[in-house]
């Protein structure tokens, strides 16, 4: 008798479940469970029923889908069942291999079971690692900060026109003046000494430097023609966007402290530090996205995980022309490697990676194609470093 399994097609808030004792022996019809404790108890009942019939504990097999599987995976682990995750690409291959292609949630349970019984799949290991979650949260915050800065600059150009000709609008001086006075016309009514006092209390300026800035600000205020009056809601919007930027900066600082404590123990982080061209932010992102490198047995598996493996089509007399990369892997890690290559080229570093790039470039390839090929070579180098525990060495 084949191993019993519970096949699960996961979606947002609910999943389709079906039991199997062998591929040709489904137990009952697929049914829907919501991701609530009251519904998830049905999985426990199904597991007991399958164990009674097959005299073996069933395995729980599900389709890996972003974040929606996490709650159901934790519940099933609490039942003491082994979990196996399959890629949506694998179940899609099974579905497309059928003569009559049918895509329904209930039918997907059978496709998932087919993958389990006909292919070798790995046991699921929860990817709940703090480094990755913190790194991705930091990335989201940085993206939000870029958006918020755009909003801030737009309001600043309206309320404080031409201020960027006097000061760097992202500097501390600009922040102190805008948050304190809110509108340039307010400065007209303030003395130079009052402006100096504000600068000395809120920033690290010498007295002479503070007076220079104060005279410059007074000169700006006397020439400024604001697009709105002092009571306009745009002034409030400007201050609000400035406060949001400061709040996001503080959040990033807190995350950086947490990441610093966690990454000190990470061998991946320590080895990647030796690769030239990897800055602080890229270093954190790459360490987080690689995670447990021991799950990759070969460099080819690591390259495929990043999505840098070439797609190949072979048919008849066509000997298998190599097309573009698959892009079916970890997009964040792929982007990081591409940025590292560009950084190496910008800094004019001389190593085996940049020489490989120029070799490809001299053969007629465009910058992008040569850079992507270099990313693949760098990925192989990184895998070798991690597997052997060696630092990057320029050859």
For each predicted feature, which ranges?
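A detector of single, family-specific signature residues
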Residues: 1-395
């Amino acid at each position: 008798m084949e191993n019993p399994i519970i096949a699960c097609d996961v979606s947002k808030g609910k999943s389709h479940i079906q039991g199997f004792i062998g591929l040709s022996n489904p137990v009952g019809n697929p049914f829907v469970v919501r991701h609530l404790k009251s519904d998830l108890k049905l999985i426990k009942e199904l597991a007991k029923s399958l164990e009674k019939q097959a005299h073996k504990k069933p395995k729980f097999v599900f389709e890996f889908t972003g974040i929606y599987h996490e709650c159901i995976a934790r519940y099933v682990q609490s039942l003491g069942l082994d979990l196996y995750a399959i890629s949506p690409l694998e179940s899609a291959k099974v579905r497309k291999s059928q003569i009559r292609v049918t895509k329904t949630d209930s039918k997907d349970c059978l496709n998932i079971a087919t993958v389990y019984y006909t292919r070798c799949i790995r046991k699921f290991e929860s990817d709940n690692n703090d480094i990755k979650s913190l790194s991705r949260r930091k990335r989201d915050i940085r993206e939000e900060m870029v958006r918020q800065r755009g909003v801030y600059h737009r309001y600043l150009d309206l309320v404080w026109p031409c201020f960027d000709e006097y000061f760097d609008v992202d500097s501390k001086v600009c922040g102190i003046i805008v948050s304190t006075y809110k509108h340039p016309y307010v400065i007209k009514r303030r003395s130079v000494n009052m402006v100096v006092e504000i600068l000395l209390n809120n920033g690290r300026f010498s007295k002479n430097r503070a007076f220079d800035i104060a005279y410059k600000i007074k000169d700006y205020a006397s020439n400024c023609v604001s697009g709105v009056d002092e009571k306009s809601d745009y002034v409030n919007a400007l201050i609000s966007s400035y406060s949001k930027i400061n709040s996001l900066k503080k959040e990033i600082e807190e995350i950086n402290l947490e990441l610093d404590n966690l990454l000190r123990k990470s061998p991946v982080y320590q080895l990647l530090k030796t690769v030239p061209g990897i800055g602080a932010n890229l270093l954190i992102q790459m360490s987080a996205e690689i995670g447990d490198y021991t799950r990759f047995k070969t460099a080819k598996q690591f390259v495929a995980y990043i999505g840098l493996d070439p797609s190949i089509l072979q048919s008849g007399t066509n000997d298998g022309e190599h097309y573009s990369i698959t892009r079916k892997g970890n997009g964040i890690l792929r982007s990081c490697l591409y940025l590292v290559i560009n950084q190496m080229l910008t800094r004019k570093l001389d190593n085996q990676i940049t020489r490989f790039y120029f070799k490809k470039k001299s053969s007629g390839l465009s910058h992008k194609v040569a850079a992507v090929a270099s990313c693949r070579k760098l990925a192989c180098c990184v895998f070798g470093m991690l597997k052997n525990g060696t630092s990057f060495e320029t050859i």
